[in-house]
Swiss-Prot record:
This is Granule-bound starch synthase 1b, chloroplastic/amyloplastic. It comes from Hordeum vulgare (Barley). Its main location: plastid. Involved in the synthesis of amylose in endosperm. Keywords: Amyloplast, Chloroplast, Glycosyltransferase, Plastid, Starch biosynthesis, Transferase, Transit peptide. It comes from the Eukaryota. It catalyses: an NDP-alpha-D-glucose + [(1->4)-alpha-D-glucosyl](n) = [(1->4)-alpha-D-glucosyl](n+1) + a ribonucleoside 5'-diphosphate + H(+). The keyword Transit peptide applies. One of its GO terms (cellular component) is chloroplast.
Length: 565
């Protein structure tokens, strides 16, 4: 799908009027030809489909093409963890000082769906594990970090600040040359929180990037980058930044007493802080429990903007899904569901009967996602006329508990402790309900994907689940759960049991069929969120920034998608 002729005409007109402005105001040696909108640089440790472990990768994969469709010039910068076959060496090298060493990084690039995808090449990223990195982005196993993560992410931020100035990119029909200095950086989560610090200490004070701004997006407050206070020296920042990092908590890890907190510094030093749903804003600023001890910093900043994520409506579309046997839309969902359910039941070894309601859980097996709550609550409902299928990987203890669930209830339950994309698609096509018992959920993607397939969510009332699932209209809410990870709260177990029973009573009723239709009638794409992101970034007032236009995203297989040496 390409920009319409009307939109191309608008872009051409704006390019003609803006060229002189950019030519005169640019501080780089190469000319910049821009059409409209803003130059936006997303910096993150994950970007789908190249590398991801969760929702961060989906956002950095899906939001930039939607902004590019509006006429903005968009780049993403992420580490090159593996030898991605669709990216090419730009032969552009820069030197950065990391810790007590000078490191040379190289940039790889491809142009996909209107976005410049840039990857930072260095042994710190490419040579951390034996063989393919895959999902081992932060450590060799779940819950274990690489010891040099601070240096790795310093390297990423320093390289990201060089990329807009040194990369001469010319794949776009409407833009050419380096991005220049009048840009908006979007730093994501604690891994990129030092970017605004380096921008101020190394560039702005030397007259570079004088008009650049930084938006800092919190995808998950639970991961903050807390390290021993002595590690501040590794960052090569002036002592004046120490108050932004300084942090005291009551925990003994990584050390007792004063620490540095990367996320605190990112919040303090950025120009605006955002997060991924309006309700998550309320939770983060409500107190230390849900704000994970950064609530005061967020109220001071303040954190006011939460924008619900969109989803990939190309990969996750029941009308075109290559992984499901019977494709369908809102008109044919009932008939197709019955057939897809029987195929799913046969695939996982359950009794084949389309009249039995099927509940699925798809996600990481960890405390945040509440998989331990679900396993504890399963006896409350699993012996009824229902089947439950759980798909996910994570902590070994929870994977073992999942296997025991299948052993205990062989007629009703199946647990698949592995990463299986085709099966996930089959589960959406064949299930009636998706259960999401998260202790906290900043936005959540799984409920959006489920609703697009007409699967009704049964979810806890937290974060983005509150904003995206409407009680009695598109799903069932179970209330908020205890956020403590150490134990499973019996109250939460009872809530799961009673609300699953409540949902099952509606199965195959007119109310249930209406909920399925309501789920599928929603626009869950990135188009709406992209407009809100545009508004938030325009408010930063970067010189030359303009609103975009109404355009269509470039399709994944369109001829504009190129990787050139």
């Amino acid at each position: 799908v390409f920009l319409s002729m009307r939109n191309k005409t608008q872009l051409a007109k704006r390019r003609a009027t803006n060229y002189e402005t950019h030519r005169n105001s640019s501080r780089t040696s190469s000319p910049i030809v821009c059409s409209t909108g803003m130059p936006i640089i997303f910096v993150a440790t994950e970007v789908h489909p190249w590398c991801k472990t969760g929702g961060l990768g989906d956002v950095v994969g899906g939001l930039p093409p939607a902004l590019a469709a509006m006429g903005h010039r968009v780049m993403t910068i992420a580490p090159r963890y593996d030898q991605y076959k669709d990216t090419w060496d730009t032969n552009v090298l820069v030197e950065v000082i990391v810790g007590d060493r000078t490191e040379t990084v190289r940039f790889f690039h491809c142009y996909k769906r209107g976005v410049d995808r840039v990857f930072v090449d260095h042994p710190m990223f490419l040579e951390k594990v034996w063989g393919k990195t895959g999902s081992k982005l932060y450590g060799p196993t779940t819950g274990t970090d690489f010891r040099d993560n601070q240096l790795r992410f310093c390297l990423l931020c320093l390289a990201a600040l060089e990329a807009p100035r040194v990369l001469n990119l010319n794949n776009s029909e409407y833009f050419s040359g380096p991005y220049g200095e009048n840009v908006v950086f979007v730093a994501n989560d604690w891994h990129t929180a030092v970017l605004p610090c380096y921008l101020k200490s190394m560039y702005k004070q030397n007259g570079i990037y004088e008009n650049a701004k930084v938006a800092f997006c919190i995808h998950n407050i639970a991961y903050q980058g807390r390290f021993p206070r002595a590690d501040f020296e590794l960052l090569n920042l002036p002592e004046s930044f120490m108050p932004s990092f300084d942090f005291v908590d009551g925990h003994v890890k990584p050390v007792v007493g004063r620490k540095i907190n990367w996320m605190k510094a990112g919040i303090t030093e950025c120009d605006v802080v955002l997060t991924v749903s309006p309700h998550y804003v309320k939770e983060l600023t409500s107190g230390p429990e849900k704000g994970v001890e950064l609530d005061g910093v967020l109220r001071t900043k303040p954190l006011e903007t939460g924008i619900v994520n969109g989803m990939d409506v190309i990969d996750w579309n029941p009308a075109t899904d290559k992984y499901i046997s019977v494709k369908y839309n809102a008109t044919t969902v009932a008939q197709a569901r019955a057939l897809n359910k029987e195929i799913l039941q046969a695939e996982v070894g359950l009794s084949v009967d389309s009249s039995i309601p099927v509940i699925v859980f798809i996600g990481r097996l960890e405390e945040q996602k509440g998989s331990d709550i679900l396993i504890a609550a399963s006896p409350e409902f699993v012996e009824e006329n229902v089947q439950i299928i759980v798909l996910g990987t994570g902590k070994k203890k929870m994977e073992e508990e999942l296997m025991l669930l299948e052993v205990k209830y062989p007629q009703n339950a199946r647990g698949i402790a592995k990463f299986n994309v085709p099966l996930a698609h089959m589960m959406f096509a064949g299930a009636d309900f998706i259960i999401i018992p998260s202790r906290f959920e900043p936005c959540g993607l799984i409920q959006l994907q489920g609703m697009s397939y007409g699967v009704v969510p049964i979810c806890s009332s937290t974060g983005g689940l509150v904003d995206t699932v409407r009680e009695g209209v598109t799903g069932f809410h179970m209330g908020s759960f205890n956020v403590e990870f150490e134990t499973v709260d019996p109250t939460d177990v009872a809530a799961v049991g009673s609300n699953v029973t409540r949902a099952l009573k509606q199965y195959r009723t007119p109310v249930f069929h209406a909920m399925v239709q309501n789920c599928m009638a929603q626009d869950l794409s990135w188009k709406g969120p992209a407009k809100k992101w545009e508004e938030a970034l325009l408010s930063l007032g970067v010189e030359g920034s303009q609103p975009g236009i109404e355009g269509e995203e470039i399709a994944p297989l369109a001829k504009q998608n190129v990787a050139t040496p």
